């Protein structure tokens, strides 16, 4: 289940190996030289977090979100990234030796500063800046309605730092659902969602639940 509150970390030279940090909202955490080897960070948010000179050896990051994160000189050797977003992330001196990437998106992130970063082009999308996305008026209205929900507003998963609709989030949603379904689903979510969450994956999970139960 998603954590209901921010689980902000402040570790310095700590040992936190083989831990389960699934669904943790780690926004604005500040960690230095901490060993997280073998830990599970699936569905975790690193929004505005600083994890400098940390060790993430063989950690998993499924549907994790690194937004404006500072990962300077951290090690992600043999880490597994799947359905993960890196937006405006500091990768200066970050070591990705042996890391695996599948369906990963990099936006406004300087990859040239990272070390040993290797991936197949089919598994990664790279955008130098936030892309423009043309959507229908009906979908735009549904997204704006959803963003009026206090928990969606707090999560920041549908908007940019300027408060505009996040084209990457919309792109991901349209990869998972047809537009007509997405419009109706977002309208339902705007009324139904009543808990804290921290990544887009939670909205996708709710929409898939509606789909499975034939509610739309």
Where are these regions (language model features)?
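Terminal module of membrane-associated proteins
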Residues: 122-216
């Amino acid at each position: 289940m998603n954590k209901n509150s921010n689980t902000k970390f402040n570790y310095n030279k700590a040992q936190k190996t083989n831990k389960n940090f699934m669904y943790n909202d780690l926004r604005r955490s500040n960690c230095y030289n901490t060993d997280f080897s073998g830990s599970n960070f699936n569905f975790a948010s690193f929004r505005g977090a600083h994890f400098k000179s940390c060790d993430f050896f063989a950690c998993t990051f499924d549907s994790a979100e690194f937004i404006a994160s500072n990962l300077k000189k951290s090690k992600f050797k043999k880490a597994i990234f799947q359905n993960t977003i890196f937006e405006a992330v500091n990768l200066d001196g970050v070591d990705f030796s042996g890391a695996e990437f599948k369906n990963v998106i990099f936006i406004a992130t300087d990859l040239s500063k990272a070390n040993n970063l290797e991936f197949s082009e089919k598994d990664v999308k790279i955008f130098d800046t936030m892309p423009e996305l043309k959507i229908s008026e009906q979908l735009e209205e549904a997204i704006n309605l959803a963003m009026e929900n206090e928990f969606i507003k707090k999560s920041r998963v549908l908007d940019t730092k300027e408060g505009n609709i996040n084209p990457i989030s919309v792109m991901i949603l349209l990869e998972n659902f047809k537009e007509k379904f997405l419009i109706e689903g977002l309208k339902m979510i705007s009324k139904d969602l009543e808990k804290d969450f921290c990544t887009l994956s939670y909205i996708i999970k709710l929409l898939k639940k509606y789909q499975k139960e034939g509610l739309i």
